[in-house]
Amino acid sequence: MKITNLPEVFTAALPVLKRINEAGYEAYFVGGSVRDLLLNRHIHDVDIATSAYPMEIKQIFKKTIDTGIKHGTVTVLYEGESYEITTFRTESGYQDFRRPDHVTFVQNLSEDLKRRDFTINALAMGVDGNVIDHFDGLGDLDKHLIRAVGKAENRFHEDALRMMRAVRFMSQLQFTLEPETERAISDNHELLSKISVERIRDEFVKMGIAPGSQKAFQIFLDTGLSEEVPGFKGKKDNLALYPQLNFSPTTEANLWALMIILLKLPNEKIPSFMRMWKNSNAMERQVADIVTFFDLVSSRAPSNYDLYQAGLETIASTIDLAHILGQPINGSALVDRYEALPIKNNHDLVIDGHFLLKNGVPAGPRVGLLLEEIKKAVLEGVISNNEAAITEFLSLNN
């Protein structure tokens, strides 16, 4: 197959390949960028593989960075862009089931492509636009298949994270997992426990917020991968609802909120669950806010003060979450009520703590408590948001 109409991300990099070729070496675009080109997907950047050794690349280009030179990768700075260029290589000895103990540079593109994870990622393209396909990646693209290169078990022993990448690609591309590859995941799912939680989390999130997440999540459950991640062991029955949902979460926060709801975790367990997954404090707070507000609107109509405390972002996330779970909720009414609030944050209130101190409220915890009482009164329409009304309120409540 020859591609003649290349997008700018490729044409901008062509001079880099040509310069390597002119120096007497092979160079190709490889991996996900070639796959996404063939699928007409957005391409963020390109990866380049070459027969040239790292020191030879450094001689060809003036500006380089030793990104991972021991493993054959040099970053070339060219025309304001950076390109990762990696020498053809083979790998061996994966004692940690993640990184190779030994890397050997080779001169053969086919040997380099053999170490790739899936056939659709083992494609290469030269400066002439010809696609090189040694493992029927083009056929698997046509069939919408995720298939391991060579023997799947070997690929997963080399890097156990590839099992999560398989279900992630399923979800993102809305492809099917090839049966032998799926069987190899089922047989080796325990290896996932060797991988850092952060890396698993990143793949899980990408899987969970992609359009094909329901089918991918079913494989995630069926193969036993779910048993190897934080907080999911023995919870298959709880999580089995996910593949039956009509919609996927579109944000990371809603994905975690959905997991917490499906797992039936009480609010006090949310922090420990989020920390097990190595989430940030900001994400933990955001998810806790969504779950708390979701529980509230599931049990009663929220007050104006509830809407104020939640904020528009949490309200919108809760509406999306209810939609995903098929729960009836008048989302537009909630948003309209929020937009009509007399104040939406502390700065909207015409007074602050200094005003209270000037009006005879003694310094201490009472100042903060009284501010909240005033906000509630303003939000519920008991008083107007002006100094005169608030002063009168103070005279009656202080």
Curated annotation (Swiss-Prot):
InterPro entries: Bact_CCA-adding_enz_type3_sf, CCA-adding_enz_C, CCA-adding_enz_firmicutes, NT_sf, PolA_pol_head_dom, PolyA_RNA-bd. CTP binds at residues 32, 35, 116, 159, 162, 165, 168. Signal peptide: none annotated. Keywords: ATP-binding, Magnesium, Metal-binding, Nucleotide-binding, Nucleotidyltransferase, RNA repair, RNA-binding, Transferase, tRNA processing. Pfam families: PolyA_pol, PolyA_pol_RNAbd, tRNA_NucTran2_2. Mg(2+) binds at residues 45, 47. It catalyses: a tRNA precursor + 2 CTP + ATP = a tRNA with a 3' CCA end + 3 diphosphate; a tRNA with a 3' CCA end + 2 CTP + ATP = a tRNA with a 3' CCACCA end + 3 diphosphate. GO terms for molecular function: ATP binding; CCA tRNA nucleotidyltransferase activity; magnesium ion binding; tRNA binding. Its EC number is 2.7.7.72. ATP binds at residues 32, 35, 116, 159, 162, 165, 168. NCBIfam families: PRK13299.1. Belongs to the tRNA nucleotidyltransferase/poly(A) polymerase family. Bacterial CCA-adding enzyme type 3 subfamily. A single active site specifically recognizes both ATP and CTP and is responsible for their addition. Catalyzes the addition and repair of the essential 3'-terminal CCA sequence in tRNAs without using a nucleic acid template. Adds these three nucleotides in the order of C, C, and A to the tRNA nucleotide-73, using CTP and ATP as substrates and producing inorganic pyrophosphate. tRNA 3'-terminal CCA addition is required both for tRNA processing and repair. Also involved in tRNA surveillance by mediating tandem CCA addition to generate a CCACCA at the 3' terminus of unstable tRNAs. While stable tRNAs receive only 3'-terminal CCA, unstable tRNAs are marked with CCACCA and rapidly degraded. This is CCA-adding enzyme. It comes from Lactobacillus gasseri (strain ATCC 33323 / DSM 20243 / BCRC 14619 / CIP 102991 / JCM 1131 / KCTC 3163 / NCIMB 11718 / NCTC 13722 / AM63).
